[in-house]
Amino acid sequence: MTVSEIFQTMDYGTAPENAAEALAWIVDQGSRFGHFIDGSMTPLGEVFESRNPATGEVLAHLSQATQADVDAAVKAARTAQPKWEAAGGHARAKVLYALARLLQKHSRLFALLETLDNGKPIREARDIDVPLAQRHFY
């Protein structure tokens, strides 16, 4: 038996990463995403489509930021900064550590979303991109 024949008769199991989980999460969120500014999601304005580059399927509709959105985000950040600074290093570290742990807890979902949105191999998203994002907060 040749290698080619072996490959043609091999049975493959399902991959541990399944896009259905990420697609269901997107649908559960309403498939429409605004901006997170000043502690809450903003209403949608003009939107653009996020498409799976492998299939062309529309994954979600994302709000296109306007100058007013950017101004609101900067204003919220400036308002929050004194309180954040006054919290002290230990309190800020606890918040950032908690954020890193949430990224870690949901790493498979983030990897699937990244793969669907960018078309990159799941291995790259799972083993490089998501862990790198987590390390930014440790």
Roles of regions detected by a PLM:
Residues M1-H61, K94, A98, P131:
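Terminal low-complexity tails and localization/encapsulation signals of metabolic enzymes
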Residues E57-Y138:
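Glycine-rich loop-to-alpha-helix module at the N-terminal edge of alpha/beta enzyme cores
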